[in-house]
A protein has these predicted regions:
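Glycine-rich phosphate-binding loop signature in dinucleotide/nucleotide-binding domains
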Residues: 59-60, 145, 376-377, 428-430, ...
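Phosphate/pyrophosphate-binding active-site segments
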Residues: 2, 129, 165-167, 189, ...
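Active-site diphosphate/adenylate-binding microenvironment
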Residues: 4-7, 12-14, 18-34, 342-424
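A glycine-rich phosphate-binding loop feature that marks nucleotide/adenosyl-phosphate handling sites
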Residues: 153-158, 387-389, 534-536
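Thiamine diphosphate
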Residues: 102-104, 297-299, 305-307, 311-315, ...
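Conserved donor sugar-nucleotide recognition element shared by glycan-biosynthetic enzymes
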Residues: 47, 74, 107, 364, ...
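Conserved short loop/turn motifs at secondary-structure junctions
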Residues: 202-206, 356-357, 438-440
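N-terminal alpha/beta PP-like core and its mobile active-site loop of ThDP/TPP-dependent enzymes
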Residues: 1-331, 432, 451, 458-461, ...
């Protein structure tokens, strides 16, 4: 077999179900020969997004793979890979490479060198014989510790070279690290000594598939639970201890309970400071738990650290809290649930005029409300897009099942939600996969709805169309006044129709729910659907600032 066949066989043994790709790359044909389905995207960043979304929903137990052409193909993939790196998504990128003899001839693009700052691990194949070792290292990097994209650049001459002998390769297992027992004892002591403890869960809880354990610890302490943007749905948000997730916008109770907390356990989060992450205000006792020791004290001063896999940390904490606390505490738990419920009710009352609005153009919060009431939230995977949809969805979309929301925002590329939604649908075909994007975002990647139609990936794409990039109005006043700089017009339902995607444009409140039902019905038949809502130019976001960040 040649090098391409070797890599394809390894992918087969690792459980690869499809290859997101854009030609030319010899791996595409080699994978097709082994019944690994090639899915050709319109744009490389969307193909990367498909691998990303698949990896998220598979929680790193299986990994999405993207193959690109040498030179312009892998150059054009940069936005997607940078986004995945910011979000710690464990996926595999395999670009073809130009001849090794020309590697340092300008302007040859050396992918394995250029991508090193935005990958967890990056390597170049020099010989066909080293391919099994490189692939083993790549899968180990994806399945141990903190996730991240890995890249193996394979020059075409290595793909074409003959591999002699039998292939000796066994699939790589997930590696997890258990916490230090002494660190667990001190963390439990701090939580139980706190007057107002709070748990802040990141996406590490989702990757560890530890949501039930998170809820168990919260009820045992007891403590309310907030989540980061990527950690949204780590606790079902209809749980009486859930405070919701945070980007720049957040539920008011998130801010209120974080302000009064004296001890915060951040688990499964890097606590990286971004404009779209909550952070932990200064002046609190911070217990920081991550599977990557480099996260500790990176951005926040940790008063106590627990390094380990989130599921193993939670198991150990539950056992230790039970040991230190003993029986009882039901009254405290009931009182805390009542306090959270009252705070949530008051916050939603503040926003009722938006949520229940009958205005036209439509209010985005009314559309979100009707989406939540109409779809099966236990059977959905939903994501926002960059910009206003993120700020509107993160606070107000109430999740009911772990892993039912894909939050992202350390890098915030317009249009990224489309690709990851296709990947999510491929990972969980029984779920309704839905992305909410604005008119600016669809301008970036919208042509790839044709990819969904061509490949029978039945996603639901919701477009909020107000004809303007509303979130940028405050930074471009002169440009807007003199040149109308923010206007972005279009009828996206008609665009979808031209790309063989069923679609509907909704302008009246009474048509929202019937439109949603029609869209869901079409996806259930096996085809994608684009549902466009003509919405108002909105600047109302649920922003309750946290001081001391």
């Amino acid at each position: 077999m040649n090098g391409a066949a070797v890599v394809a066989e390894i992918l087969k043994r690792e459980g690869t179900e499809f290859l997101a790709c854009y030609p030319r790359n010899p791996l595409i044909e080699a994978c097709a020969a082994l019944n690994i389905r090639p899915i050709l995207c319109r744009q490389e960043r969307v193909g990367v997004g498909m691998a990303d979304g698949y990896s998220r929903i598979k929680r790193g137990r299986k990994n999405g793979v993207f193959a690109a052409q040498a030179g312009p193909g892998i150059e054009n993939a940069f936005p997607g890979i940078a986004q995945a790196y910011a979000e710690n998504v464990p996926m595999l990128i395999i670009p073809a490479g130009l001849p090794l003899a020309r590697r340092y001839v300008r302007p040859v693009f050396r992918a394995s060198d250029v991508y090193r700052p935005v990958t967890k691990w990056s390597a170049l194949a020099h010989t066909v014989d080293e391919l099994p070792d490189l692939m083993r290292r790549a899968f180990h990097a994806m399945r141990s510790g903190k996730g991240g994209p890995v890249l193996v650049e394979i020059p075409n001459e290595i793909f074409e070279a003959e591999y002699k002998g039998a292939l000796d390769y066994t699939a790589v297992k997930v590696a997890r690290a258990a916490p230090d027992p002494d660190a667990i004892k001190e963390a439990a002591r701090l939580l139980l000594a706190a007057k107002n403890p709070l748990l802040l869960a990141g996406q590490g809880v989702l990757y560890a598939q530890a949501s039930e354990k998170l809820v168990a610890l919260a009820e045992l302490v007891p403590a309310p639970v907030a989540t980061t943007n990527p950690g949204k749905s780590a606790i079902p948000e209809n749980h009486p201890l859930a405070l919701g997730a945070s980007t720049r916008s957040r539920p008011k109770m998130f801010t209120d309970f974080m302000k009064q907390a004296d001890v915060v356990l951040a688990i499964g989060s890097s606590l990286t400071i971004t404009p779209f992450g909550p952070g932990v205000p200064r002046g609190k006792t911070l217990i920081h738990s991550s599977n990557d020791p480099d996260d500790i004290n990176k951005e926040h001063r940790a008063d106590h650290a627990v390094v380990g896999d989130a599921a193993l940390v939670l198991d150990a904490l539950i056992a230790e809290v039970e040991k230190q606390k003993g029986k009882g505490g039901d009254k405290a738990l009931a009182a805390l649930k009542d306090e959270v419920a009252a705070a949530k009710k008051a916050w939603l009352a503040e926003w009722a005029k938006h949520i229940d609005s009958d205005e036209a153009p439509l209010n985005q919060y009314r559309v979100i409300r009707d989406l939540m009431r109409t779809v099966d939230r236990d059977g959905v995977i939903v994501t926002h897009d960059s910009g206003s949809p993120r700020e509107q969805m993160i606070p107000f979309w109430e999740t009911t099942a772990p892993g039912s929301y894909m939050g992202w925002g350390k890098s915030t590329q317009l249009g990224y939600g489309l690709g990851i939604t296709m990947g999510a649908k491929l990972a969980a075909p029984d779920k309704l996969a839905m992305n909410i994007m604005g008119d600016a975002a669809i301008g970036m990647t919208g042509m790839d709805i044709e990819t969904a139609a061509r490949n029978r990936i039945p996603i639901l794409t919701v477009v909020f169309n107000n004809g303007v990039m509303a979130a940028e109005r405050d930074v471009l006043p002169i440009s807007i006044e003199k040149y109308g700089a923010l206007a972005v017009g279009g009828n996206y339902a008609k665009v979808a129709e031209g790309l063989n995607v069923a679609s509907l444009r909704v302008e009246k409140p009474a048509d929202i729910v019937p439109g949603i039902k029609k869209a869901v019905s079409v996806t259930q038949s096996g085809a994608p659907f684009l549902l466009e809502f003509v919405v108002k130019e909105g600047y109302d976001f649920s922003r309750y600032p946290l001081a001391g960040l």
